[in-house]
Amino acid sequence: MSFLILVRHGQSIWNLEKRFTGWVDVDLTDQGKIEAEKAGLLIKNQNINIDFYYSSFQVRANHTLKIIQKVLKSKKDFVRAWQLNERHYGELTGLNKIETAKKIGEDKVFEFRRSWDIKPGKLSRESSYHPLNIETYEKIPKELIPDTESLKDTYNRVLEYFKNEIQPKLINKNILITAHGNSIRALCKYLFNLDNNQITSLEIPTGNPLIINFGENLKINECKYLDLSLIHISEPT
């Protein structure tokens, strides 16, 4: 038996400001830190020993994990993987969602955010928001760094890493991942065999641990959120 715990980072500064965040590094708000601490307490109450910790390259997910580990009194190192990053929102990066909807229409914004294979225009490689101009990504091959992504692109990126690096470690081991709305959405599509329509409408709340219990041959026995009050209130960034 093994457990996989998925936690979307706590509320970030740009979540609060309703801006498209994507690969930009923004930290948690005070509320986000509280959410992360609460997530840690919920996980602690499950009495599960975590063998491996994973997070994305992004500060908000890393900070969430560090807070959780502090609550769990765990000093284990965690793996940072850029493949677990949020979806790259291209030229929408940094824009306010409400103002953008007024300019190009709510239907168009909804299409960009929730369609399976439609992506926004590319983010200029001259932009300070582009990963190529961020020191964190200087060791990542340039050809692997996106200018924009669809949810399908995000799914393919996340799943390749998960299947190669994380899933093999799940056999009789427990793993905790802190990541993002769309990268966790991608994992849920794979783990629960969701179709494209189901995955685009799936909401992932901030700071609410999703715990998946696997049995023999990694067959899912049970899946539940640890805080039912937080379901269906969050949106991807």
Language-model features: locations:
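Active-site glycine-centered loops adjacent to acidic/histidine catalytic or metal-binding residues
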Residues: 9, 83, 180
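Glycine-rich N-terminal loop/short-helix segment of MobA-like nucleotidyltransferase
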Residues: 11-26
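Amphipathic, non-transmembrane alpha-helical scaffold segments
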Residues: 29, 33, 54, 58, ...
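Active-site-adjacent alpha-helix immediately C-terminal to a catalytic or transition-state-stabilizing loop
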Residues: 4, 62, 70, 145, ...
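Phosphate-coordination/substrate-recognition cap region in phosphate-metabolizing enzymes
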Residues: 39-131, 137-139, 189-211
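Residue-level detector of conserved catalytic or cofactor/ligand-binding positions
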Residues: 229-237
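Short catalytic helix/loop segments, enriched in acidic residues and glycine
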Residues: 22-38
